[in-house]
C-alpha cells in the first residue's frame, strides 16, 4: 500500500478500489430515475386518455353514450396505470434523495422491497394491457360466433382514444419490465464479491 492509500498491483499499476462500482451505481440509478419518470408520465397519460374517453351516438333516436366503464378491462387498465404512476412517483423521489445524498449501496431488506414492488407492478401493468388489448380486438373486429357487433364502427372516436391509451400503457408495461430487471441487478449485486467495499448504505 502506497502512502497515497492507493493499492498497487504487482506490475506497479495503481488500482482504485470501488471506483468502477460507484460509476456503475450512478449509471444504474440514473437509468432507474429516467424510467420511473417515464412510467409516471405515461401512466398518468394512459389513465387520463382512457378515463376521460366518452362518445355519444344516436341510434334510432336513442342516445347511447360509450364510457370506459362499459368495459371492465378498461377500468382495470385505468386503475393499474394509476397505481403504477403513483408507485413510480414515490420511487422516483427515493431515487432523487439517494442521488442527492450520494449513497452508493442500500440495505438488502430495502432492495428486496423495491425488487418485489417492481415485479408486482410489471405483472400488473402487463396483465392490464393484455386484457384491454383483447377487449379492444373484440370491439374492433366483433365476434360473429357470439353475435357481438363491431363497436368501433359506431364509436370511432372513442376507440381511437382508447387505442392511444393502450399504446401508452404498453410503453408503461415495457418500461416496468426493464425497470424490474434493473432492480433485480441492484439487488443481486449486493450478494456479489464487491458488496460493502464502498461502505455507504441507505
Swiss-Prot record:
Highest taxon above the source species: Eukaryota
Designated name of the protein: CASP-like protein 2B1
Origin species: Populus trichocarpa
Main location group: membrane
InterPro entries in UniProt: CASP/CASPL (IPR006459), CASP_dom (IPR006702)
Quaternary structure note: Homodimer and heterodimers.
Signal sequence annotation: none
Cellular component GO terms, alphabetical: plasma membrane
Transmembrane parts of this sequence: 30-50, 73-93, 110-132, 165-185
Cytoplasmic compartment segments: 1-29, 94-109, 186-202
Family affiliation: Belongs to the Casparian strip membrane proteins (CASP) family.
Disulphide-bridged cysteine pairs: none
Record flagged with keyword Cell membrane: yes
UniProt membrane topology term: Multi-pass membrane protein
Record keywords: Cell membrane, Membrane, Transmembrane, Transmembrane helix
Localization: Cell membrane
Matches recorded under Pfam families: CASP_dom
Residue spans, topological domain Extracellular: 51-72, 133-164
Amino acid at each position: 500500500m502506497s502512502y497515497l492509500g492507493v493499492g498497487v498491483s504487482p506490475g506497479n499499476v495503481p488500482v482504485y478500489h470501488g471506483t468502477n462500482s460507484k460509476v456503475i451505481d450512478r449509471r444504474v440509478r440514473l437509468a432507474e430515475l429516467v424510467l420511473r419518470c417515464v412510467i409516471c408520465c405515461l401512466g398518468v397519460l394512459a389513465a387520463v386518455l382512457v378515463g376521460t374517453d366518452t362518445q355519444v351516438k344516436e341510434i334510432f333516436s336513442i342516445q347511447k353514450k360509450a364510457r370506459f366503464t362499459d368495459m371492465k378491462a378498461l377500468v382495470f387498465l385505468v386503475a393499474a396505470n394509476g397505481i403504477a404512476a403513483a408507485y413510480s412517483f414515490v420511487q422516483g423521489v427515493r431515487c432523487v434523495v439517494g442521488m442527492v445524498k450520494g449513497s452508493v449501496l442500500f440495505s438488502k431488506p430495502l432492495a428486496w422491497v423495491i425488487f418485489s414492488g417492481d415485479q408486482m407492478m410489471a405483472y400488473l401493468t402487463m396483465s392490464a394491457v393484455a386484457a384491454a388489448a383483447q377487449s379492444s380486438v373484440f370491439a374492433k373486429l366483433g365476434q360473429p360466433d357470439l353475435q357481438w357487433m363491431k363497436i368501433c364502427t359506431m364509436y370511432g372516436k372513442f376507440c381511437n382514444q382508447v387505442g392511444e391509451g393502450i399504446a401508452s400503457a404498453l410503453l408503461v408495461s415495457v418500461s416496468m419490465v426493464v425497470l424490474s430487471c434493473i432492480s433485480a441487478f441492484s439487488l443481486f449485486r449486493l450478494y456479489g464479491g464487491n458488496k460493502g467495499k464502498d461502505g455507504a448504505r441507505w
